[in-house]
């Protein structure tokens, strides 16, 4: 059987003590601070979203998994739920199923497994138009392909998924 598949969101959130009433955005990387992973663009996109949608400050959270995940707590305008780097595939499946969207602001990527895994779990993705990402994300269908290095368009992608009726629970 395929390990990566949609599961009960409430149960998945309970496993990581994540809140039920919030929309949760996921960002994960072995090393969060690696500039190639584009975390600065995610931070900037979140700041833009918080300015445009101040009401989201209470209703949106960011789940970050990876080494140095705690470092983002001070830099993001939304509540951050830091998790360590997770190698166990069953736990990774639960993380995908606990969130509302997966962000991959990488500045260089081939065919990122994390997009395939998230999508197999039914989670829409936002990524930049770089490497294999545009071949994996069907723009405005199962995710959003943002203009390369545009924090503003990345924010548009997060906003689109969070407000698209198809993805609203």
Please report, for each region that a protein language model flagged, where it lies by residue.
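Short hydrophobic beta-strand element within catalytic cores of glycosyltransferases
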Residues: 124-127
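Conserved acidic donor-binding segment of nucleotide-sugar-dependent glycosyltransferases
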Residues: 139-140, 144-151, 160-165
């Amino acid at each position: 059987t395929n390990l990566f598949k949609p599961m009960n969101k409430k149960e998945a959130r309970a496993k990581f003590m994540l809140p039920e009433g919030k929309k949760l955005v996921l960002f994960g990387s072995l090393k969060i601070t690696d500039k190639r992973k584009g975390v600065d663009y995610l931070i900037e996109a979140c700041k833009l979203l918080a300015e445009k949608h101040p009401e989201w400050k209470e209703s949106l959270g960011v789940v970050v998994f990876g080494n140095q995940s705690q470092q983002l707590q001070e830099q993001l305008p939304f509540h951050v739920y830091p998790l360590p780097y997770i190698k166990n595939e069953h736990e990774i499946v639960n993380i995908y199923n606990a969130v509302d969207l997966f962000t991959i602001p990488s500045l260089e990527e081939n065919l990122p497994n994390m997009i395939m895994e998230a999508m197999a779990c039914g989670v829409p993705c936002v990524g930049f138009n770089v490497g294999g990402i545009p071949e994996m994300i069907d723009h405005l269908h199962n995710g959003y392909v943002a203009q390369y290095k545009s924090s503003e368009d990345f924010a548009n992608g997060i906003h689109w998924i969070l407000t698209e009726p198809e993805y609203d629970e």
